Design a protein with these regions (language model features):
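Short S/T/G/P-rich N-terminal loop/turn motif that feeds into the first structured element of a domain
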Residues: 1-70, 79-88
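Short, exposed beta-strand-loop hairpins at the edges of beta-sheets
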Residues: 72-74
Length: 88
C-alpha cells in the first residue's frame, strides 16, 4: 500500500471541481483508490491537493490512464500534476 500526494491546477472553481470529484469517488473506491484528504492552497483555489491510499504507483497510473478524460472534464489540468509517493 502506498500513500500518494497529488498537487495540480484546475481550470474552474474549487467548488465545481469538488462536486465532480465527489461524483467520481465511487469509481475510484471500486478501483482501490481511497481519498484521505483534498483541499486547496490558502488564497489560491486553483491549486489543489489530493492525498490518497492505493495498492501501488502503477495501480494509480492505470486508474489515471483509464479515467483521464473524466478527470480532465472535472477541471483537473492533468499536465500540471506533481505526484509524491510515500511507503510504510
Amino acid at each position: 500500500m502506498i500513500t500518494a500526494i497529488l498537487k495540480f491546477d484546475i481550470s474552474n472553481t474549487f467548488t465545481q471541481w469538488e462536486q465532480a470529484f465527489y461524483t467520481h469517488q465511487p469509481v475510484a473506491r471500486a478501483a482501490g483508490l481511497y481519498e484521505l484528504y483534498h483541499g486547496h492552497e490558502p488564497g489560491n483555489d486553483k491549486r489543489v491537493v489530493v492525498v490518497l491510499n492505493c495498492l501501488s504507483e502503477e495501480h494509480m497510473q492505470k486508474f489515471i490512464e483509464a479515467n483521464g478524460k473524466a478527470m480532465a472534464s472535472s477541471g483537473h489540468i492533468l499536465e500540471s500534476t506533481v505526484t509524491e509517493i510515500y511507503v510504510n
